[in-house]
């Protein structure tokens, strides 16, 4: 069984037992969270697609860790003008362990 969930402005295909990295969620490590924005639920050949959400469907997950992705380096240059700008960014994430999918 799998589900398509929406969190942090992105969509993820998840199944029970998987670990995924999502945009940072304000939750403690070890805390169990319930994601109720489920866009689709599939079980073998059967697929239930919401309009836009599947009513009554939830995904339970446990927060495993918080962290930062690798650094992304931004370099801007204006040719012939002696203008250079360097910038870096590390996006924060939350790692989730998917426990169960209830449809």
Swiss-Prot record:
InterPro entries xrefs: bL21-like, bL21-like_sf, Ribosomal_bL21, Ribosomal_bL21_CS
Keyword rRNA-binding: yes
A GO CC annotation given for this chain: ribosome
One Pfam entry name: Ribosomal_L21p
GO biological process: translation
GO molecular function terms noted in the UniProt entry: rRNA binding; structural constituent of ribosome
Keyword Metal-binding: no
Keywords on record: Ribonucleoprotein, Ribosomal protein, RNA-binding, rRNA-binding
Recorded family membership: Belongs to the bacterial ribosomal protein bL21 family.
Known function: This protein binds to 23S rRNA in the presence of protein L20.
Subunit field text: Part of the 50S ribosomal subunit. Contacts protein L20.
Identification of the protein by name: Large ribosomal subunit protein bL21
Gene, per the UniProt record: rplU
């Amino acid at each position: 069984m799998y589900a398509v969930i929406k969190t942090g402005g992105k969509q993820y295909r998840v199944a029970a037992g998987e670990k995924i990295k999502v945009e940072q969620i304000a939750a403690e490590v070890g805390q169990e969270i319930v994601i109720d924005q489920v866009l689709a639920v599939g079980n073998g050949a059967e697929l239930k697609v919401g309009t836009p959400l599947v009513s009554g469907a939830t995904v339970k997950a446990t927060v495993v860790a918080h962290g930062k992705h690798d650094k992304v380096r931004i370099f801007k240059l204006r040719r012939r003008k002696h203008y250079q700008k360097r910038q870096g960014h590390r996006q924060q994430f939350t790692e989730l362990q998917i426990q169960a999918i209830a449809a």
